[in-house]
Amino acid sequence: MEQPSDSAPVYARRIMGIETEYGITASASNGQRVMSPDEIARVLFRPIVSKYSSSNIFSPNASRLYLDVGSHPEIATAECDSLSQLIAYERAGDAMVNRMAVQAEETLADEGEKRAVYLFKNNVDSAGNSYGCHENYLIGRHVVLKDLGKALLPFMITRQLICGVGMIRPAKGDDPACFVLSQRADQVWEGVSSATTRSRPIINTRDEPHGDSKRFRRMHVIVGDSNMAEPTMALKVGSTLLMLEMLEAGFEVPNLSVLEPIQHIRAIALDPTGRTELPLEGGGSTTALAVQQELCTAAERWLEHREEAGTPTTELARVVDLWKRTLQAIDTQDFSSVDREIDWVIKRSLLNRYRDRLGGDWAHPKLAQIDLTYHDIRPGRGLYSVLEQRGMVERWIDDAAIDAAIDTAPQTTRAKLRGEFLAVARELDAAVTVDWTRMKVNRPEPMTEEFSDPFVSEDPRLDGLLDYMRSHPGS
């Protein structure tokens, strides 16, 4: 069997994070005026701005909360170093912004405007505007990101088969409304580049490591959907972790370089059978399903070689099992083995039940409403949330892990240092400034430390900052 190379570090324990932007709206009834997303967002962030004089803060769990361009609330999770930990903090982000929405409803009611505030964890609004779910993976500085990105492109353009959230794509010209696998496939136009909005790439190459730039880079993946189902999220991130480990190790991964890969991503989204034909650079062709099958087989072999660090190999074996079952379901078109785990399968099944009653037309407005409601993050109101509460979908983590992540930073990474710093600053009402790598006590005289290693969760320099704060209470 193939043996990993010793030529470069393989990050079995890898720093990761997810950035989630939320769509926002509010109900309007009984002659109420329609509130713009900007107005709703201002009400949503009013308590944050009142407390911190900013709409861009680090929360108690060391995640970043801010108002992004287009009036989208966004949470960037704190640094995580294992799969289940990352899912817990991503779900904690949902809970945090939901709390803000509930508070915004109370504020509006106090002002005589009783209405519901909705936050949607999706990627496209009714006007066709797109907002993202961005994945971040630490890689070594020695890695040429464009080369790594090129090697990953066949995986990335076909990954929607296993982890797309699905959506009804409205009619376009002569093309009727239809169900597609991914909400982001129509929104990316390049493979690997430094752009983010004008011509969104699959992988962004801007050099912002949020750490020691001599040692680390950050791979920023823009193409992914915002998942509601925890197992789908685990498959999206877990399969990507395995791909990165194999490529870093020089493990034998099939050469599946696709000719003009970005040209095929939209065709793949239209085909839930995975039979979309992909021409190969070396001649011949393959299919989207075959690409995923070959990479899944390689990942299963890799499990026998990987170092036991970060995400446990037993958990990644669960990822590979779900990966295999999903590909088998696509191959046979019998989805009964994954219809409680894979987002697009769950959503399509729900929509098909209603579509049959409504005459089979994907353009029916009732279906668009169901599609959107799937992504409402309010417990007991959002459609996916109701399925989860009724035990009709599978979980990857439990509620206790999410609850613990709402107010406590990850304890295994640099986020722990930031969380402790923020906790003491809140306790002492100290004026501080924080970003991903720096912590600064502003008064009486500025004192700053930079923490450039995201893997380190203990550092005596933090004690110096905390002692300085405590010796100048109220400064």
From Swiss-Prot:
<feature type="binding site">
    <location>
        <position position="77"/>
    </location>
    <ligand>
        <name>ATP</name>
    </ligand>
</feature>
<feature type="binding site">
    <location>
        <position position="19"/>
    </location>
    <ligand>
        <name>Mg(2+)</name>
    </ligand>
</feature>
<dbReference type="GO" id="GO:0016879">
    <property type="term" value="F:ligase activity, forming carbon-nitrogen bonds"/>
</dbReference>
<dbReference type="GO" id="GO:0019941">
    <property type="term" value="P:modification-dependent protein catabolic process"/>
</dbReference>
<feature type="binding site">
    <location>
        <position position="436"/>
    </location>
    <ligand>
        <name>ATP</name>
    </ligand>
</feature>
<dbReference type="GO" id="GO:0005524">
    <property type="term" value="F:ATP binding"/>
</dbReference>
<comment type="similarity">
    <text>Belongs to the Pup ligase/Pup deamidase family. Pup-conjugating enzyme subfamily.</text>
</comment>
<keyword id="KW-0547">Nucleotide-binding</keyword>
<keyword id="KW-0460">Magnesium</keyword>
<dbReference type="Pfam" id="PF03136">
    <property type="entry name" value="Pup_ligase"/>
</dbReference>
<keyword id="KW-0436">Ligase</keyword>
<keyword id="KW-0833">Ubl conjugation pathway</keyword>
<keyword id="KW-0479">Metal-binding</keyword>
<dbReference type="GO" id="GO:0010498">
    <property type="term" value="P:proteasomal protein catabolic process"/>
</dbReference>
<comment type="pathway">
    <text>Protein degradation; proteasomal Pup-dependent pathway.</text>
</comment>
<comment type="pathway">
    <text>Protein modification; protein pupylation.</text>
</comment>
<comment type="function">
    <text>Catalyzes the covalent attachment of the prokaryotic ubiquitin-like protein modifier Pup to the proteasomal substrate proteins, thereby targeting them for proteasomal degradation. This tagging system is termed pupylation. The ligation reaction involves the side-chain carboxylate of the C-terminal glutamate of Pup and the side-chain amino group of a substrate lysine.</text>
</comment>
<feature type="binding site">
    <location>
        <position position="66"/>
    </location>
    <ligand>
        <name>Mg(2+)</name>
    </ligand>
</feature>
<dbReference type="GO" id="GO:0070490">
    <property type="term" value="P:protein pupylation"/>
</dbReference>
<dbReference type="GO" id="GO:0000287">
    <property type="term" value="F:magnesium ion binding"/>
</dbReference>
<keyword id="KW-0067">ATP-binding</keyword>
<feature type="binding site">
    <location>
        <position position="64"/>
    </location>
    <ligand>
        <name>ATP</name>
    </ligand>
</feature>
<dbReference type="InterPro" id="IPR022279">
    <property type="entry name" value="Pup_ligase"/>
</dbReference>
<dbReference type="GO" id="GO:0019787">
    <property type="term" value="F:ubiquitin-like protein transferase activity"/>
</dbReference>
<dbReference type="InterPro" id="IPR004347">
    <property type="entry name" value="Pup_ligase/deamidase"/>
</dbReference>
<feature type="binding site">
    <location>
        <position position="74"/>
    </location>
    <ligand>
        <name>Mg(2+)</name>
    </ligand>
</feature>
<feature type="active site" description="Proton acceptor">
    <location>
        <position position="68"/>
    </location>
</feature>
<protein>
    <recommendedName>
        <fullName>Pup--protein ligase</fullName>
        <ecNumber>6.3.1.19</ecNumber>
    </recommendedName>
</protein>
